[in-house]
Amino acid sequence: MAFDFPDSYRYADSHEYAWQDAAAVRIGLSAYAVDQLGDIVFVDLPEVGAELNRGSSFGTVESVKAVEEMYAPLSGVVLQRNEALLANPEELQNDPHGEGWLLVIQPGDPSQMDQLMDAATYAAKVAAT
């Protein structure tokens, strides 16, 4: 299956994305990760004000197949969480790179974005799996 990974996004090995919008960064799960999970039934996200540490778990996503941890692609403080997604977790499947975003954070170290994969590198990694 072919996936569309937006060029302006950066991707972590653990399949989360980060998208810089002015001083804030939107975080979500890639379309590949969402596809692998199947039907999503529950999403657990941290509260606004919570601190994220790059590479550490910040929540879980539950599908009919499994419960998976989600890992922070960047360190920072949660500014916003997608409340609509908490009420309707299936939105994550419908539009993972758009309305299915998870969090907006204030990054602690914006240079961490440079350590994430660009879309072409991530697409090649996914194609090789």
Curated annotation (Swiss-Prot):
Segments forming domain Lipoyl-binding: 24-106
Pfam families: GCV_H (PF01597)
Cofactor binding description: Binds 1 lipoyl cofactor covalently.
A cellular component term, taken from the record's GO annotations: glycine cleavage complex
Top-level taxon in the UniProt lineage: Bacteria
Requisite cofactors: (R)-lipoate
Reported function: The glycine cleavage system catalyzes the degradation of glycine. The H protein shuttles the methylamine group of glycine from the P protein to the T protein.
Oligomer status and interactors: The glycine cleavage system is composed of four proteins: P, T, L and H.
Family: Belongs to the GcvH family.
Record GO biological process: glycine decarboxylation via glycine cleavage system
Residue numbers bearing the N6-lipoyllysine modification: K65
Gene behind the chain: gcvH
Protein name as annotated: Glycine cleavage system H protein
Key words, A-Z: Lipoyl
